[in-house]
Amino acid sequence: LIKTKPGNTIVSSCFILVRPSATGENEVLAMSDCAINIHPTEDELVEIAGESAACAKIFGVDPKVAFLSYSTLGSGKGEDVDKMRNAAHKAHEKYPELPIEGELQFDAAVSPRVARTKCPDSVVAGHANTFIFPDINAGNIGYKIAQRLGNFEAYGPILLGLHAPINDLSRGCNASEVYSMAIITAALA
């Protein structure tokens, strides 16, 4: 039986998305939690963010973490907005070395032009590469949109928070994805 590693209370998941960029280097993103936690609490989102940032680093990403919402820094109201804002603040306190922002709309998280308008003082906005979704619905839809319409290769779900590396595969995966996940699991060992 493989349990959570010390200090962790949950298992979560991360997808690593990769596509070639115009500069010739790969664009690499991390998206969480897209496969395990249906409605994570604020504290679970904090743990998911820390684990996702660590996973992103394994893939050469200098994580800039965005807690996603339909609101950017208070532009909207509601329980879901509060949850993401509070989780981002808690994550910033727990991981002060990480650039973390939230709550952010996706456009403010990835577009420098939009970020200059919506949150000009943010270090993360416009440059986010590690995305924390409010729930599994948003996360699963988000990574599949990136994969199918954004031409990203999706690797995952990579299971996070466990004492030993294990992973899962989608029923829709192909042989190349099975091979890649075996390599990823070995790299996590």
Regions found by a protein language model. Name each.
Residues 1-189:
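Anion-binding alpha/beta catalytic cores of soluble intermediary-metabolism enzymes, centered on
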